[in-house]
Swiss-Prot record:
One of its GO terms (cellular component) is plasma membrane. This is A-type ATP synthase subunit B. One of its GO terms (biological process) is proton motive force-driven plasma membrane ATP synthesis. Has multiple subunits with at least A(3), B(3), C, D, E, F, H, I and proteolipid K(x). It is a peripheral membrane protein. Its main location: membrane. Belongs to the ATPase alpha/beta chains family. Component of the A-type ATP synthase that produces ATP from ADP in the presence of a proton gradient across the membrane. The B chain is a regulatory subunit. It comes from Thermococcus onnurineus (strain NA1). The lineage of its organism: Archaea, Methanobacteriati, Methanobacteriota, Thermococci, Thermococcales. It holds the Pfam family ATP-synt_VA_C. It is found in: Cell membrane. GO terms for molecular function: ATP binding; proton-transporting ATP synthase activity, rotational mechanism. Keywords: ATP synthesis, Cell membrane, Hydrogen ion transport, Ion transport, Membrane, Transport.
C-alpha cells in the first residue's frame, strides 16, 4: 500500500548521484521524491530501487551539498510527470523541463508520465510518406520516412550539430496542410553548443514551431536520463492529441549512455560490454520505440537520434545496439570532412530501411527509386577505382573508368556537399542526380529504365526544351 506524502530524515548514504533512505514503507519503483536541504532548497528525485524498508533514490539536480543528517525526503506517491501544453511551442527548457528562456512557467493542459503509455503493436501504422530535410544526401539517397527512427552516426569533432540544426530548421512534410513541429533534446552539450542551437532556431524563425530541451555539460549527468523522455512525452502530446507531424532530434545519445553507465556503476551492478549496463539495449529501446504512427491518428513521431561513436568505432556498444533497434543509419565520414565537404555524409555505409516505402510515384517522383540505385552504383564504382589508381596510376584506366572517377568527385562536391543554409527541394535533388549521371555513357545507366532516361536525362530534356 502506497503512503504518499510520507516524509523521512533517515538518509543513510549519499554516493554519486544516488542516496539511500532507510526505514521507508510503501515506496514504489519510479516514484517521484521531493528532497529538501537544511537551507530550504528543494530538489527532485526518483526511486531507482525499492526493497523492504530501504529505497535508492536518484537525485536529478545532483547530490552536491546534501547532508545525510539534515536532508529531508518526501515520497509523493506519483510517477514523474511533465506538464504539457501547446504553449510549449517556441519555448526553451532545461533537461528536466524548467523554462530557461526568461518566459513564464507553462500553465499545463495536462500532466503526462515521462515514460509514456505502452503502445499495442497491433495499433501501430506502418511508416510511410516522405519527410523533406532539404539535404540531398538524405532526401535522395537515404530518405527519411514519417514515423521512422533514423539515427546519425557521427564522430568527435564532426559537424553533427550543424547538420542537426539544419534538419530541424528545414524539415517539412510535403503536400497538404500538415502541421509540423520539431522537438529538440540535447544532452551533455557545452554552453557554446547550446547558444549555437538557440541562435540557429531564433534567427531563422524555426523556434516558433519547436520545443527545445537543453541539458548542459555541467548539469548533473542524472538529468540526461530524463531529458529524452521529457522530449518524447511532449512529442506524443503534440502528435496524438493535436495531429501534428513531429520530428524528434536527440543529441548526443552517447552522453545519455555514459550517464546510464555512471548510475549503473554507482549502484554497483555487474557491468556488461565496456562497462555499460547489461540492460542498455532495453533502456535504449524504451526511447527509440516511442517513434511511429498509430492507426486512426493523423499525427506521427519521427526520430533522428545523433550519437558520436567513440574512436569512430561503429562496433562500439552504443552504435551497435542502436543499429539493432532503429531502421537504418546516416554515417558521417571523417575523410569527406577533411576534404572540406559539408555535410560529410558517406552514402555507401548509410542506409534507410524504410526508404522504399516513402519514395516513388505519388510520394517523391517516379524515377527516384531507380535513380538512387544508379547513383549508388556509379559512386561505389568511382570509389573502387580511386583505390585502384593509388596502386597502378590513372594511365592504366579506360576512358569509361576515368568518367567514373570524375563522377565520384563531382558527386561529392556537388550532390553531397551543400551550404549550411541551402534548402534543396526533392525536385532539385533528383535533377542534380541526373545532371551528374550525364557524365557517364548512357550505356552505363543499367539500373534505370529507358523511359526515365528519355524523360529526365539532361540530353533529352534540352531537346524537349
Amino acid at each position: 500500500m502506497l503512503m504518499p506524502g510520507m516524509e523521512y530524515s533517515t538518509v543513510s548514504k549519499i554516493y554519486g548521484p544516488l542516496m539511500i533512505v532507510q526505514g521507508v514503507k510503501g515506496v514504489a519503483y519510479g516514484e517521484v521524491v521531493e528532497i529538501e536541504t537544511e537551507s530550504g532548497e528543494k530538489r527532485k528525485g526518483q526511486v531507482l530501487e525499492a526493497r523492504q524498508d530501504m529505497a535508492i533514490v536518484q537525485v536529478f539536480e545532483g547530490t552536491r551539498d546534501l547532508d545525510i543528517k539534515t536532508t529531508r525526503v518526501r515520497f509523493t506517491g506519483e510517477t514523474l510527470k511533465v506538464p504539457v501544453s501547446m504553449d510549449m511551442l517556441g519555448r526553451v527548457f532545461n533537461g528536466i523541463g524548467k523554462p530557461i528562456d526568461g518566459g513564464p512557467e507553462i500553465i499545463p493542459e495536462d500532466r503526462r508520465d515521462v515514460h509514456g503509455a505502452p503502445l499495442n503493436p497491433v495499433a501501430r501504422a506502418y511508416p510511410r510518406d516522405f519527410i523533406q530535410t532539404g539535404v540531398s544526401a538524405i532526401d535522395g539517397m537515404n530518405t527519411l520516412v514519417r514515423g521512422q527512427k533514423l539515427p546519425i552516426f557521427s564522430g568527435s569533432g564532426l559537424p553533427h550539430n550543424m547538420l542537426a540544426a539544419q534538419i530541424a530548421r528545414q524539415a517539412k512534410v510535403l503536400g497538404e496542410e500538415e502541421q509540423f513541429a520539431v522537438v529538440f533534446a540535447a544532452m551533455g552539450i557545452t554552453y557554446e553548443e547550446a547558444n549555437f542551437f538557440k541562435k540557429s532556431f531564433e534567427e531563422t524563425g524555426a523556434i516558433e514551431r519547436a520545443v527545445l530541451f537543453l541539458n548542459l555539460a555541467d548539469d548533473p549527468a542524472i538529468e540526461r536520463i530524463i531529458t529524452p523522455r521529457m522530449a518524447l512525452t511532449v512529442a506524443e502530446y503534440l502528435a496524438f492529441d493535436y495531429d501534428m507531424q513531429v520530428l524528434v532530434i536527440l543529441t548526443d545519445m552517447t552522453n545519455y549512455a555514459e550517464a546510464l553507465r555512471e548510475i549503473s556503476a554507482a549502484r554497483e551492478e555487474v557491468p556488461g560490454r565496456r562497462g555499460y549496463p547489461g540492460y542498455m539495449y532495453t533502456d535504449l529501446a524504451t526511447i527509440y520505440e516511442r517513434a511511429g504512427r498509430v492507426r486512426g491518428k493523423k499525427g506521427s513521431i519521427t526520430q533522428m537520434p545523433i550519437l558520436t561513436m567513440p574512436d569512430d568505432d561503429i562496433t562500439h556498444p552504443i552504435p551497435d545496439l542502436t543499429g539493432y533497434i532503429t531502421e537504418g543509419q546516416i554515417v558521417l565520414s571523417r575523410e569527406l570532412y577533411r576534404k572540406g565537404i559539408y555535410p560529410p555524409i558517406d552514402v555507401l555505409p548509410s542506409l534507410s530501411r524504410l526508404m522504399k516505402d516513402g519514395i516513388g510515384k505519388g510520394r517523391t517522383r517516379d524515377d527516384h527509386p531507380q535513380l538512387s540505385q544508379q547513383l549508388y552504383a556509379a559512386y561505389a564504382e568511382g570509389r573502387s577505382l580511386r583505390d585502384l589508381v593509388a596502386v597502378v596510376g590513372e594511365e592504366a584506366l579506360s576512358e569509361t573508368d576515368r568518367k567514373y572517377l570524375k563522377f565520384a568527385d563531382r558527386f561529392e562536391r556537388e550532390f553531397i556537399a551543400q551550404r549550411y543554409d541551402e534548402d534543396r527541394s526533392i525536385e532539385e535533388t533528383l535533377d542534380l542526380g541526373w545532371e551528374l549521371l550525364a557524365e557517364l555513357p548512357e550505356s552505363e545507366l543499367k539500373r534505370v529504365r529507358k523511359e526515365y532516361i528519355l524523360k529526365y536525362h539532361p540530353k533529352y530534356r534540352k531537346r524537349e526544351g
